[in-house]
């Protein structure tokens, strides 16, 4: 508990120092950017007129839809690749092929083939999340200590038992790392997708603000994305601690 409180205190101190440095840089004119007070005032305005809340829900809906779908498919595919050599040989080249293509490069193709509604945005988020998570899951399976597997076989365990009792628990830390990376990829992708083709969302709001050189609104969107991403990452860290207490 003391270590956790110390860590929280250091987190808060780090944020305070960062915001203080930001304030000093803008107040002294060292950088031509809006200060924390200006950004806070704009955030309050956007909250009161409902724009910020609407943008948050629009971006969250897209992120969660694509992220959950991507992770839900990545975990079984990763286990399949790691457990069966034939599946690995069939699937792994395609995974590596698509990993080399930035999901953002797929956006124009997705818009042409899927239309301009929510489908292309969710698809590219799904792709980014899937590719990040599937590799981590696969790596977790093939990294399991062979001694544990051989010991289970000596004790008479069947493949299904070894998979459920040895492979899955040993792979959980790798899976959660992949999920966290996938979450970051999802947020990066949704912002880019909204910059190109959207009528709502935090990325769309930044693109509109750019047209009018509205820096405070751009900063509000950036800070909001950072806060939402940090909160979701902390939830995943809590799940990691709960699932890997052993």
Swiss-Prot record:
Q: Which residues cross the membrane?
A: 12-32, 63-83, 94-114, 122-142, 172-192, 211-231
Pfam family of the protein (one): BPD_transp_1
Q: Which UniProt keywords apply?
A: Cell inner membrane, Cell membrane, Membrane, Transmembrane, Transmembrane helix, Transport
Q: Where in the cell is it found?
A: Cell inner membrane
One GO CC term on file: plasma membrane
- Biological role stated in the UniProt entry: Probably part of an ABC transporter complex. Probably responsible for the translocation of the substrate across the membrane.
Protein name, UniProt field: Probable ABC transporter permease protein BMEII0107
Which species does this protein come from? Brucella melitensis biotype 1 (strain ATCC 23456 / CCUG 17765 / NCTC 10094 / 16M)
């Amino acid at each position: 508990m003391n270590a956790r409180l110390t860590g929280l205190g250091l987190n808060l101190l780090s944020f305070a120092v960062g915001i203080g440095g930001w304030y000093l840089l803008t107040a002294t004119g060292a950088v031509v950017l809006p200060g924390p007070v200006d950004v806070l005032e704009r955030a309050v305005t956007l909250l009161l007129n409902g724009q910020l809340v609407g943008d948050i829900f629009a971006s969250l809906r897209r992120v969660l839809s694509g992220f959950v779908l991507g992770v839900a498919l990545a975990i079984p595919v990763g286990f399949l690749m790691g457990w069966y050599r034939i599946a690995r040989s069939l699937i792994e080249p395609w995974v590596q092929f698509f990993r080399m293509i930035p999901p953002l490069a797929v956006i124009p193709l997705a818009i042409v083939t899927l239309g301009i509604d929510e489908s292309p945005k969710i698809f590219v988020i799904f792709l980014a999340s899937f590719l990040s998570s599937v590799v981590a899951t696969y790596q977790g399976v093939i990294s399991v200590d062979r001694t544990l597997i051989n010991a289970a076989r000596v004790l008479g365990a069947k493949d299904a038992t070894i998979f459920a009792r040895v492979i899955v628990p040993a792979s959980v830390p790798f899976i959660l790392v992949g999920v966290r990376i996938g979450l970051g990829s999802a947020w990066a992708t949704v912002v880019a997708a909204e910059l190109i083709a959207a009528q709502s969302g935090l990325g769309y709001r930044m693109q509109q603000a750019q047209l009018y050189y509205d820096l405070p609104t751009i900063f509000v969107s950036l800070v909001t994305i950072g806060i939402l991403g940090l909160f979701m990452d902390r939830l995943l860290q809590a799940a990691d601690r709960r699932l890997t207490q052993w």
